[in-house]
Regions:
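Canonical positions in the second alpha-helix
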Residues: 47, 94, 142, 176-179, ...
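Amphipathic alpha-helical repeat scaffolds of TPR domains
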Residues: 22-26, 55-73, 99-127, 150-158, ...
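Start-of-domain marker
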Residues: 21-85
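Terminal, low-structured helical/coil segments at or just beyond the last alpha-helical repeat
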Residues: 192-196, 200-241
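Short coil/turn connectors between adjacent alpha-helices in alpha-solenoid helical repeat scaffolds
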Residues: 28-32, 70-87, 118-133, 161-172, ...
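Short coil turns that delineate tetratricopeptide repeat
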Residues: 52-54, 99, 146-148, 181, ...
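Bacterial Sec-dependent N-terminal signal peptides
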Residues: 1-29
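Surface-exposed, polar helix/loop patches in the mature regions of secreted/periplasmic/lumenal proteins
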Residues: 81-143
């Protein structure tokens, strides 16, 4: 597929939503598709500060996407050491601008990639007492840009409980309960969200067992038993309850 075809396809997907904004950010799209991430980000940042464009969601999203792409490339590591963190930060800012999710669904592939990166980063930190603060920031950001993702809420609650923030953990579990109810059939969740949910259910069960509340561990584990029982780590947890 040629670059021109890719640009046309992406522009078509977003065309209905773009009509609602004063500015059509074809300049950002072209730079992004051409992999000129630094230039694209710098230009998007000017839009986020301009009086006529600072309320538009898309420039904030482009800043996030460019940071994400730069976080994967060694040539940007020295100048942008916090690119992965900034990708999450700007994704949150984008979502605050796009409260009605006018553009959100056009970027499902990006959300899956960002979720995967964030979840792996957060889980790598969650078992290290020195990493809890960063893990908390990561999962908090995930719930900020994608509050419909139930596993992110449960992971955030787990980190908060581990950090002796019981009240905050309880609030996050309330948000998890709402998100899981709204999700409906969890087998239809995107793969990245299913994986995070499975891992969160296992960790939450382990946490409750350590507290001596095996009944609560089993009650929440039941959420995933019809979907995850074929996976050894989940089955091992279930059999231990």
């Amino acid at each position: 597929m040629t670059k021109q075809t890719i640009i046309a396809a992406i522009a078509f997907l977003a065309s209905y939503s773009l009509q609602a904004q004063k500015h059509v950010y074809e300049d950002l799209l072209v730079l992004y598709v051409d992999e000129k991430y630094e230039k694209c980000m710098e230009k998007a940042l000017t839009y986020t500060e301009g009086d006529a464009t600072k309320k538009d969601p898309l420039p904030f999203l482009y800043v996030s996407m460019c940071n994400y792409e730069m976080s994967k490339l060694e040539k940007y590591a020295a100048d942008y050491p916090k690119a992965s963190r900034d990708a999450l930060k700007w994704a949150e800012k984008y979502r605050k601008k796009d409260k009605e999710k006018e553009f959100f669904g056009n970027y499902e592939d990006y959300w899956a990639s960002l979720n995967t990166m964030a979840a792996e980063s957060g889980e790598n930190l969650i078992d290290d007492p020195k990493g809890l603060s960063k893990a908390k920031a990561t999962f908090d950001a995930m719930t900020g840009y994608y509050p419909e993702n139930p596993g992110a809420w449960m992971m955030l609650a787990i980190v908060q409980y581990k950090s002796n923030l019981a009240k905050e953990g309880d609030l996050s579990m309330t948000s998890f309960d709402k998100a899981i109810a709204a999700a409906g059939d969890i087998s239809t969740l995107p793969p990245d969200q299913k994986k995070l949910l499975k891992n969160a259910l296992i960790r939450y069960a382990d946490l409750q067992v350590a507290k001596g509340d095996r009944a609560k561990a089993r009650r929440y584990a039941e959420i995933g038993k019809d979907v995850f029982m074929e996976e050894p780590d989940f089955k091992g947890m279930w059999d231990s309850l």
